[in-house]
Amino acid sequence: VAQPAYLLHRGDALDAYGSWPAPVAVISDGAYGVRGFHGDTTGVAPLADWYRPHVEAWSRHAGPATTLWFWNTELGWATVHPLLAESGWDYVQVITWDKGAGHIAGNVNGKTIRRFPVATEVCALYQRRLELPGADGLMPVQQWLRHEWQRSGLPLARANEACGVRNAATRKYLTQDWLWYWPPGEMVERLASYANERGAESGWPYYSLDGQAPVTGKAWDTLRHKWRHVHGLTNVWRLAPLHGAERIKGTMKRAAPRVYRPSSLSAAHLNQKPLQFMHRILNAVTDPGDVVWEPFGGLASASVAAIEAGRFPCVAELDHDFAEIAAQRLADALAG
């Protein structure tokens, strides 16, 4: 039986997570606290509770190298950040989408406004916090690397000999301060071989993830989230909100509680994301064939980009009308 090119769940993502394959990346574009869709909150105070069951599910199903992209307003992201941190997601950086002055043109009353007009939103990148098992239980990866060497009873300086370096092992790979550097798989494999050949007898092999055998360099490298660098690209992305052919309009439906009289020129979704941005974040942290979750699909822009990029998207959308549009966009993307 041929495998589908994507999975679309017409309903709550909470009912779909258990049947989806584990994600390499999660792209979240849910509640902002701005009444931006039916089901969005009024204000940011309820956001943590709104996201909590989803964050718990992401945490259960994520792999050690899963990344999370979290779209929101500045304040919405700041409100949910503590929940993400306590749930085992480590902050990497924030991308700022600068929509330009055209985004607020004609919508600012200079006599009543008491702040600078907002023409941005953000997308925060998180990586799954890595804790590794050992003879003495789970430990953060930085602590685990040094602890395994110390457990062998070998002098710390011998780690440099094991890695064939002057001092990089003790100065970078095994240090416990801010100078710590993620060691390449080749170096971890060398540490493991040296410690197991020359260290004290132990019931749990040194640098083992399962208590049976030391970790290999190849296995070690899969524990770190992927990253594909693009020179010249910073964390500020300047692009006007969609207005051209990519923007979906004319559904004559109220896209959100604050939309009262939609016309044939009204956007189907108030905050449709550019495919250009979705391709950018997918390219940064995933490879062809990787599973991408889009739990709050809307118009499924992330999943459309995922299909175009050869990834395997799993998308959910609760709103019937949005789900219909998403289904058509996904089919069109697959057809090329």
Regions found by a protein language model. Name each.
Residues 326-327:
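Conserved SAM-binding loop
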Residues 2-316, 320-323:
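Core catalytic lobe of class I
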Residues 322, 331-336:
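Conserved phosphoryl-transfer catalytic core
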